[in-house]
Amino acid sequence: MDEIVEDSSRVMEIEGQNDDLDRCVVEEVELTVPKTDDPTLPVLTFRMWTLGLGACIILSFINQFFWYRQMPLTISGISAQIAVVPLGHLMAKVLPTRMFLEGSKWEFSMNPGPFNVKEHVLITIFANSGAGTVYATHILSAIKLYYKRSLPFLPAFLLMITTQFLGFGWAGLFRKHLVEPGEMWWPSNLVQVSLFSALHEKEKKKKGGMTRIQFFLIVLVTSFAYYILPGYLFTMITSISWICWLGPKSVLVHQLGSGEQGLGIGAIGIDWATISSYLGSPLASPLFATINVTIGFVVIMYVATPICYWLNIYKAKTYPIFSSGLFMGNGSSYDVLSIIDKKFHLDRDIYAKTGPINMSTFFAVTYGLGFATLSATIVHVLLFNGRDLWKQTRGAFQRNKKMDFHTRIMKKNYREVPMWWFYVILVLNIALIMFISFYYNATVQLPWWGVLLACAIAVFFTPLIGVIAATTNQEPGLNVITEYVIGYLYPERPVANMCFKVYGYISMTQALTFIQDFKLGLYMKIPPRSMFMAQVVGTLVSVVVYTGTAWWLMVDIPHLCDKSLLPPDSEWTCPMDRVFFDASVIWGLVGPRRMFGNLGEYAAINWFFLVGAIAPFFVWLATKAFPAHKWISKIHFPVILGATSMMPPAMAVNFTSWCIVAFVFGHFLYKYKRQWWKKYNYVLSGGLDAGTAFMTILIFLSVGRKGIGLLWWGNADDSTNCSLASCPTAKGVIMHGCPVL
């Protein structure tokens, strides 16, 4: 309550101003976000701390647990957002209302009144801290499970915690640019805003209709019941690759039709986990972003990949058409461990004898698209947002600046988080990372100058990527450029490369996550200091749980991530960790000079940097030449070029299913059923998330842990139905289970 600096009459004063001034610049925000605030509502309550910490711990454990699975379903904070509602109301009824430490500065009550939406938002912020995973876990997995090296717990934990907290510093530097302007609207936040409204607003039921909470409960129960089919009884519907059935013994047909190992033409998944696993909820994607992603996917997957493969570029036919694996020149798997010396560096002599590492052409092109996305992002933001960014930078600390409607309410009613809070966290983290680089250098391999360079890259790209994410719901990654830079400057050290990538790339990603939460707090009128406190505590708790869970699974599950030793039907294949490990070999152990430089076979891939830099100019020039055609400005090359950045480990079926659903809801329903979309779209997304997540947990706890499965044709996965999709088509190449041409 001490954060309130104006009474609620100020809100009414703002609401009485000119309608044009009050109208949000983004229509979806205008339709979804409430324009009211009650600054007297209690926020940092006993209920909030209890339910928030509980949700954070549970989700952190569950998400880290499922991260190692073939379809790494991420249980979003929406699941906890729903589950805590009855618990919050129950606590409001049964907890004592007595005041503790009455009359002092610290007085509080375990039950200050009805369970309110602001408590609920902060509980969800705690839950969001546990919704996902800590990217630095990949380093732990790579070292222990793939490189088969020992890793002490303390440096592992310090890596995890510094990765997460470094982002707070960057978030503080750029929050005014990426939170306060109305144009920076962060589309996925509207799912949670809509759900909060459904759960807390008293909505009158129309005759023959449903309230949003009734609709949500129906979707929740339905999706919960339905997921028993793709999750256990009929798993084949996670990827229906029907084209493979037309040619059971044809490698070509399998390559074209496989949704998991091929191009996925016609493949579709009737499974919410398949649809939303890698790209997030399609219901939260703006139409122009959906169209850009779809164009990018179609051009890359159905035009570029087949052309490169059948022209045999980079000996494409010697390897699978779609794979993140590393291969010998004859098509067999590359024995990475054989080229590492005792100091965990590249053994140059053995590498020279063994021969260079080869990739599938798709994997090589994926890296090229990463180069293009990076340069396209810089040029696009400078061309289309550069002037606005410059104005925002100049006016960020000016008193009389134009502000978004919701920002004006927050400025009137609450005190901001002082910048020195962010500076303290930033300085402490950089100091701790420096300590790690000196004291545990044998483990992390990263020198002090590498730490500073990683921080510089994160600072430079946070506002650029932030503009893209805040307006399109797509977030181009920096993993390629960070790997490239340190790979050239400090080659043959895989752990140094991984650590540099985590500090340079993931600290930026974390910053954008914190900024997105700040925007959610702005939409829901949460006191900024309370929001900051929830973020810091939630992040700390989640890191502890993530680290402990990952460490436990690495010890407890035999042959975790090792496909060669796991049972054929095992889910513990770790697709994300495998890609991360392969990247550490390419960029860290072998180094970009031997792969993409003058010593490598893939040097031509560097031309993608130029392609990405040039592409946005065509759109920019077209907007100047044809200003009446507003659709031209919606052509977004960073999104088009980065559309398949998650492939692999994402598969074709994830994209085909996502694009169809996103287009149906983002175009047809938004255009022709606007009122239905406004009322139910984001609520539907939340219900599907929650129901699928709850059934996934139930399946694992009831039968998954015991290894109880059903053996019948409906549980044959895509790799069984399209078993020849990963076969080479070059003459004389021998691969187990494949015909020799």
UniProtKB/Swiss-Prot annotation:
It comes from the Eukaryota. Its main location: membrane. Pfam families: OPT (PF03169). One of its GO terms (molecular function) is oligopeptide transmembrane transporter activity. It comes from Arabidopsis thaliana. Belongs to the oligopeptide OPT transporter (TC 2.A.67.1) family. One of its GO terms (biological process) is protein transport. Keywords: Membrane, Peptide transport, Protein transport, Transmembrane, Transmembrane helix, Transport. May be involved in the translocation of tetra- and pentapeptides across the cellular membrane in an energy-dependent manner. This is Oligopeptide transporter 9. It is a multi-pass membrane protein. It is found in: Membrane. NCBIfam families: ISP4_OPT, OPT_sfam. One of its GO terms (cellular component) is membrane. The chain crosses the membrane at residues 48-68, 121-141, 153-173, 215-235, 287-307, 320-340, 362-382, 419-439, 448-468, 537-557, 602-622, 650-670, 683-703.
